[in-house]
């Protein structure tokens, strides 16, 4: 692990990293998040009886949109031309939660970790938003990077 923050310049100021001279490589990142809720809330989602419609479909699209907008949300992220964004949601009734996984890919000069994390986080937030009328104490947890490939720092996997 490096001991230097790449987004801090020699004067100690935040700046956007210059990737001009970096090579274009295939890059991929996977992230996850969980949202825990009451069994009744999860059953409402799973049965499709939620009055706001298909919660998973809405959360999936929100996660995809969020990945594409990451540089608008996180100030020092580069705008990226993503070639793939995938968001998967899996109800886990045995744990009263939804497991959210995201995948982002591109051919570029910088990684897609933040895009994958943003996709998973936003999908979880969307589930919360759609279900808050029936339950306000849902818990979003374990948002983390699972894997990244490509670039100078190589392969990382939890």
Swiss-Prot record:
GO biological process: Mo-molybdopterin cofactor biosynthetic process
Reaction(s) this enzyme catalyzes, per UniProt: (8S)-3',8-cyclo-7,8-dihydroguanosine 5'-triphosphate = cyclic pyranopterin phosphate + diphosphate
UniProt key word Transit peptide: no
Active-site residues annotated for this sequence: 129
This enzyme's EC code(s): 4.6.1.17
Pathways per UniProt: Cofactor biosynthesis; molybdopterin biosynthesis
Keywords, ordered alphabetically: Lyase, Molybdenum cofactor biosynthesis
One example GO MF annotation: cyclic pyranopterin monophosphate synthase activity
Recorded family membership: Belongs to the MoaC family.
Chain's role: Catalyzes the conversion of (8S)-3',8-cyclo-7,8-dihydroguanosine 5'-triphosphate to cyclic pyranopterin monophosphate (cPMP).
Assembly behavior: Homohexamer; trimer of dimers.
Protein name per its UniProtKB record: Cyclic pyranopterin monophosphate synthase
């Amino acid at each position: 692990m490096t001991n230097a923050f790449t987004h801090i310049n020699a004067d100690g100021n935040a700046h956007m990293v210059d990737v001009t001279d970096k090579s274009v490589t295939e890059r991929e990142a996977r992230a996850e998040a969980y949202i825990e809720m009451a069994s009744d809330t999860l059953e409402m989602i799973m049965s499709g009886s939620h009055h706001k419609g298909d919660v998973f479909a809405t959360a999936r699209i929100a996660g995809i949109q969020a990945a594409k907008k990451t540089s608008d949300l996180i100030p020092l992220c580069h705008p990226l031309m993503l070639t793939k964004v995938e968001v998967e949601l899996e109800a886990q009734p045995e744990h009263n939660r939804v497991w959210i996984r995201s995948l982002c890919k591109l051919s570029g000069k910088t990684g897609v970790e933040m895009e994958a994390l943003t996709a998973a986080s936003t999908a979880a937030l969307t589930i919360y938003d759609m279900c808050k009328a029936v339950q306000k104490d849902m818990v979003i947890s374990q948002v983390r990077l699972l894997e990244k490939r490509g670039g100078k720092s190589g392969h990382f996997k939890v």
